[in-house]
Amino acid sequence: MSEADAGARDESPSRTAEEPAAAMRIKEERRSSSVDVVDVGNGELLVLHSIFYQGKTLRLPGNRAHMYPVVFQMIKGVCSLVKQLVVAFPKGWDQNTPSISEIAALTKSFNRVAKPFASNWSGSYNTDTLKEWGEPNCSAEVAKAITTYAYECAVPRPADLNQHYKSFTSETYGETNPEQLISIIDELNIGPQDVFVDLGSGIGQLVCLTAAYAKCKKSVGIELSQVPSNFAQDLAGYFKKFMSHFGKNHGKFEHIQGDFLNPKFKQLICEEATVIFINNFAFDAALMLRINTELLQDLKHGTRIVTTKELGTNKKEITFRSTSDINAISHTTELKTTESAVSWTSSHVKFWLTTIDHTKLIKYYEDQRRRQEVKSSREGSEISDGRDMGLKKRKSQRESSVHPDKLQKTEQAAASSHQSPKWNEPDTDYTPPAKKPKKEKLLREQQDATPASSHHHGASSSSGKDREKEKEKKKNKIYEEKKVKTPKPPKSSSSRYSSETPTSHHHHHRSNSISHSSDVIRPSQPKATAPPPPLVPAPARATASTPPPAPPAARAQSPKREEPLEPPTDLIHHGGGQLDAKTMNALHTIREAATTSAQAAAIQDAINSVLSQPTEASPSAFGPPLAHLPAPVAIYPTPPPPPAPAPAAPQQASAAPAAPNVMPVCTEIAAEQRHTFMIPPTDPFYNMIVSYYFAMKQFCNQSKTADPEFVGRLRLDIEAEEARRAELKESITLTSTQIDELLATGVNTLKSRLDELGMPSVTDVTELLAGSKQIVTQHKGLTNTVAQMENSVAVEEQKLRLIGGPDAVRYFDEAMSHPNVDIAKLTDLVITTRPPNFVAQILLPDDSPTASIDSKVSPSSSSSRRPRQPKPRANNTAAGAGGGGKRGTSGGRKSDGGGGGGATEDVELEIRQFVQHALKVDNAVKEKERKARGNFMAAAADRIPR
């Protein structure tokens, strides 16, 4: 059993198995009860007896002063539970923290009283008196208190923890308070089935707290720095002692010194760990990237990660680019936060829970596989459709080789009708219709062929008639098939609107196009996108059961082009007069403005309604159709009066009266045919409004019926937008990471510069400005001091030269370079090394007040002149004794008088020389000051950022 497992116990120990051990422990405590501070070699042990069931005697080093307050707090806590233990203590013992000697005395008294309690309570947890402290398992408060005791014993000076790392790095030390960890354990329901791993555990107090409160199967802390690891080992030892003293059970725990990114820890982190705690608040981006790629991506399913900085965001969808992100295999939620959750700040710090869920990525790949299968199946169906189309094309080619005339006519008939579903589709083999011959040419050919056929033999004519009848039958059959055939909905938007309107007028148009008057100019072939509306005679549209018009062969029997044609009956005004050419041209222009079948039907209906109204105006005064269009139904709900029947032509007098010229009403677009657009068809915006209307109508129909193609396109658009959104979010995340890295680099650079400038504790811009001003002021003061000192040095050097000679400064510098300087010897050396013609200068007191004591020479003093006198002064006493007093007196007066005149001249000369030297020195000092100021300004200019 390892050292870390020494404190592990069963939650329900056997009383019979523990009684012998308890008896032995009582004997051991009795042997040591008389001595509370035991000498062990050079140190001492502080002994404290336990009153808890299965508790062991606590022995702490007695030579460490910081442990005595911990023992005092323990005694105080036990006495608050058992009031009888304070009988031997003096009054007011718990008011203030006593000294070390007083704590030792209290410990001795406590051991004396606690011994009988331990004997009486042996074999019982005594939870009635000890409350939660008597339980074998730790509650939240008990685990917190025991961990705090161990922390205070292991770390005598917590401030030392803030000195072993560099500021603003990933090794920055910060502690999570025990209250926050207890809240996390309760919220995540961490228990004996979990393996708790703290990456960057510091001194390991969270590992010990988890082992005490959650009793995990294993709690491991990994720390890189050496100093916190040493404290963690001490903390583990004291934690085991305190747990044994209080008789508590705890799980296995271990503190490891090393880098948690080392591959040797990967099995522990990725395979065994179920709960991982990472205080990544100060981790830089590079370290977080390594953690994500080297550890988090390999975690097993269900692993829970608690962090102080969010690892990822809850993205709803996974894209191909985000499959390698932590968000693709995890869910992130915010945990509850207590007050003062961390030690480095009083602000609110969030804690995040990231749960590994590999099923997210599995579901994503399954969805991708299903989409690929659907796509491949669609492609296979398209290929099969293409094969069918190829077969049809080859079949049509074979038919064209056998019956070229028949195929050509069939294609022309199909091209003339715009109901072909594939006439404008880009993905089909569409052949544009051949140009039809002009109607006049066809009429001439038919008329020329009629008289020629009358001269043939009877048998040949009969056979020719049979062939003509067969051809007519075939053509009628083809015509009926085309008319009955339901067209396929086209794909292009231009043909989308024509599919919702009746198309019978397209078939009638070919047979009646030649019924127009010769004054109307019509194109030889209608436009592919805007077929003109038909001009069908009224009798042909009398009823819905009217048979289709005659085939082209029957139309060959029509009269020649040169014969005058009767005006169409639908262009005959109900007033009895025929419309003039100008009005007919206007009507045809209006009809040609239609681009879709719906517009053509609406225009024809409007024209019919206008022509059916009786009017008293003459045909020549008939205005354009726009002036006679009926008002919208929504505004004028009263229907117009029934139109009067048109007068019959002379050749049709015996026939029944023709029905009104009205287009058949379509139930789907009845409102459109009754002019609900509220604008005339000739308006420039009419086509655009109608096209928008039908496009919106088709869109609504597809939405209501949930068209698979429409739903598929909509889903593809949604997926594309979601992918775009995911890419933008990922780009934002990468950009934010880069910004954070740059900000961290800038902050580190700023901190290093502030450390160099002596401002390591700056936390605000105001403090930075104040420190900058202080540095500038200090620099100015130092500059002034240097200038003054240089001035003083120059003055002193000049004085030294004046007094000691030109080489005095050199001797002085050489002597000052030695550690021990003898001023007397230096003075003698200066004096002896003077040149023979050296004359000591006199310094005036006004110019050099500091040198008046050392080097000022009085004008009346002869000490400075004695070395220059060849003869010594005569002794006045000897002169008096020799009887030459008068001579001596006169000689003395002469000497005094002569000496006084020479001294005055010498003094004046020395004064002039001194003034000259003083001026030179002053000029030199000023020049130095000027240079110093210039250098300072240049240095200041260089420091200013550009």
Curated annotation (Swiss-Prot):
Belongs to the class I-like SAM-binding methyltransferase superfamily. DOT1 family. Residues 1-28, 368-577, 849-905 are annotated as: Disordered. This is Histone-lysine N-methyltransferase, H3 lysine-79 specific. Residues 880-903 have a biased composition (Gly residues). CDD domains: AdoMet_MTases. Interacts with zfp-1 (via C-terminus) to form a heterodimer known as the zfp-1-dot-1.1 complex or DotCom complex. Keywords: Chromatin regulator, Chromosome, DNA-binding, Methyltransferase, Nucleus, S-adenosyl-L-methionine, Transferase. Residues 491-502, 512-528, 855-864 have a biased composition (Low complexity). It comes from the Eukaryota. It comes from Caenorhabditis elegans. Residues 410-422 have a biased composition (Polar residues). InterPro entries: DOT1_dom, H3-K79_meTrfase, SAM-dependent_MTases_sf.
